[in-house]
Amino acid sequence: MNNYSWIQKKLHKFALSSQIIRETSFDIEKSLVSTKNINEDHVFVAGLARSGTTIMLNGLYKSNLFASLSYSDMPFVLAPNIWSNFSSSYKNTKLIERAHGDGIKISTSSPEAFEEVFWMTFNDKDKESAKNFKDFIALINNKYNKKRYLSKNNQNIRRLDLISKILPHSKILIPYRNPFQHSNSLLTQHKRFINLAKKDNFITDYMKWIGHSEFGPNYIPIIDENLKHQNEMNINHWLEQWYKTYLNSYKKYINSENIYFVSYEKLCQSEEYWENILNLLNIKIKYSFSFKDSEKEFSARFDSELAKKATDLESKLNSLTI
């Protein structure tokens, strides 16, 4: 986003900042492209940001079984087929490190989390949203000539019940990491993107337009009720977000038939664990994927009571099997 030209920035503003433009592009796309959806065996990856959702997206996308929104679909993500007729000249297969500075490299063909643009356009409490969401998935599958859709959207942790209701035959993966490593990563990224945004106002606008509020200048807590640690520059705020978010999900979905918790540490340590996930998702082609151990040394003063609760919850999550 920090390498966009003037015209690219203006095009993103035109396509993403206006509710009317987003709705109109979607309506035109539906009028020209088939929305027939013959399959609902889709996969949704949704957890707190920095839980390994992107690397898991990349790992599953490698199977070549799924369609997923990519950087090439920006900024007209609600009209991927129409936009593809105009965007071919913008394609760049050269890999560059993404703005997070975490070693993950991307190109215009890389899958990414742009689905939230749909939910920002169509209220998830609207009765028409279910049909529109199915149509949206069908349009993406149509463009990439696939039958299954792969989504990575951290904001979906707020609406897993809705997605399960709309697509009951799909599977949902909730990645999680060690709470202390995860909290440190969130705080680090929060500070990083706030500093980046001070140097380039477009970053704030871009993150707002794609619904990226997990950290940075547009930060909105996933859970904001009854917080003991409200200072987002304190690591305990992020540990509390980890604990409350995953505790809520654990209580609600522990016995769910289509929602599964996935340990990022186990992905890094066990090839068998990865193979179990492939089997779970009905991916017949077996292949390896390198999940990078992201553990970092750092010092911080954690709330002892909160730290114990988080550790106990992590143990419960780790006891679950795929």
Can you say where each PLM-predicted feature lies in the sequence?
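PAPS-dependent sulfotransferases, especially Golgi type II membrane carbohydrate sulfotransferases
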Residues: M1-N37, L187, I194-I322
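Pre-Walker A (Motif I) flank of P-loop NTPase domains
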Residues: N39-H42
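The Walker A (P-loop) glycine that initiates the GxxxxGKT/S ATP-binding motif of P-loop NTPases
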Residues: A46-G47, K152
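A conserved segment at the C-terminal end of the G1
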Residues: T54-A67
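PAPS-dependent sulfation machinery
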Residues: S72-L150, Y219-I223
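Short catalytic-loop micro-motif centered on adjacent basic/acidic residues
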Residues: R148-K152, F261-S263
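Conserved phosphate-donor/acceptor-positioning beta-strand/loop module used by diverse small-molecule
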Residues: K152-N154, I163-T188
